[in-house]
UniProtKB/Swiss-Prot annotation:
This is Putative competence-damage inducible protein. It comes from Caldicellulosiruptor bescii (strain ATCC BAA-1888 / DSM 6725 / KCTC 15123 / Z-1320) (Anaerocellum thermophilum). HAMAP family: CinA_B. Disulfide bonds: none annotated. Belongs to the CinA family.
Amino acid sequence: MVAEIICVGTELLLGQILNTNSQYLAQKLAELGIDLYFQTTVGDNMERLKMAIDIATKRSDVLIFTGGLGPTSDDITKEAVADYFGLTLVLDEDILRRIESFFERRQVKMPQINKKQAYVPEGAKVLHNKNGTAPGLIIEKDGKIAILLPGPPFEMQPMFEEEVLPYLEKFSKQKIYSRVLKFIGIGESSIEEALKDLILSQTDPTMALYAKPFEVELRITTKKESEELAKSLLQSMEYRIRERLGEYIYGVDRQLLEEVVIGLLTEKKLKVSVAESCTGGLICNKLTNVPGASEVFDRGFIVYSNEAKMKLLGVPEQVLKEHGAVSSQTARFMAQGALSNSLSDIALSVTGIAGPGGGSETKPVGLVYIGIATKDNVESFEFRFSGDRLRIKEMTSKAALNILRKKIIDY
């Protein structure tokens, strides 16, 4: 079975709204083992929408629409689909009562235009909307299936989970199972080189690499009827990959680097403090976003100015004058200062030039030093990142968290 997603809305074409519906639906279809070869976005135009439907029916079995089910004149998805399949729209009294009740609960009189939403194509299965007034629809006609869903994600997602998912499961004999390995401290090309024989000979499971800022994801995928067999295949391939590159793998699936760090700190009963200059609190923010961080995160220092570095962390004025705020020496003193002015076992520091200005020939934009200190040792590491200010800050935070991760493992 082949599915196609058709997202309706001129606002999508204008870039005014981020289309998260396509991503969500694509993931759900993949989990079901339903092939998705095409995604289409079309504006609120009857002629162009019918054209998209005509193209989709020639190449796909299931058409999943999102958007265009509202009460206004530019909400035309239901009308376009009904007209294309030659179906008459009829008033559904049950839906009308639901819409009226929706407004009554809010003590608001129902606008007459909302009555439009109670008309459905004859013979369609109605999908109830618990969070809005637009019902969803499933239409089976001429060997094709059209599934119409509301555009707002908080309406669409519960409807899909509760009603569409069980409907589609009966068509899905095989499901797609996957495992994502998350790498850090190694580039995409180096991973591919190390796994070249596995990648070239892949049939089942398959592998695909995806580069992200300062990390790489490797997705292992298989399509099986049996979950037990799928897991066995994925685990076997993961073991072979870990044998070669295990030191660079920090997590799996949806794990975040900061979650792994907090988990390791908790496991070893350690506390950490962080001193940040160029990242301006980003590392502290990432760590404290993780539940349980309060047990292992002691404090953070945002020391943007030289005065703050001297006053709060005890960085010697002479060091700042001789080596500058962006230097390995300053990074080490910052880490030591954060350690001595806290109740932590480990202290992390970052200082750098995020840009776009402030760089020089000897110290260009993207130059970053990361320091880490324990009671027995202090180290610093140099990095040279590229990109805009936000990208450099993000990459710096990931590099710092990875250094912290490795230090905790060796502690």
